A protein has these predicted regions:
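Short, well-ordered beta-strand segments in beta-rich or mixed alpha/beta enzyme
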Residues: 2-9, 39-66, 88
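Residues at secondary-structure transition points
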Residues: 9, 13-16, 20, 47, ...
Length: 93
């Protein structure tokens, strides 16, 4: 099992657009082979800070997710508004 924790900080003026774009990623990602969990969370004190929790059955499934059209669309729409992106790829002990 492979899990990713992603912290995304967007420009404050892009926060609502980011929330919508992230919501639009959920269903197509959950339909991908190997996806177990895919959830976004929004910080309660900073509405321009988001966290993503991804759980995949393999590294290959996780890596394939990054090449999908819906991820490409997301990055095209939000790329210029992303101020910081932290990605932590983990595996269970």
């Amino acid at each position: 099992m492979h899990t990713a924790f992603i912290r995304v900080k967007v420009a404050p003026e892009a926060a609502e657009r980011a929330a919508t774009a992230m919501q639009n990623l959920v269903d197509p990602t959950l339909a991908e082979p190997g996806c177990i969990t895919y959830e976004f969370y929004r910080d309660l004190e900073d509405p321009s800070l988001f966290l993503c929790f991804e759980h995949w059955d393999s590294r290959e499934s996780m890596d394939a997710h990054g090449t999908t059209p819906h991820v490409a669309t997301f990055l095209t729409e939000l790329g210029p508004s992303i101020e910081k992106w932290e990605y932590n790829h983990t595996a269970a002990l």
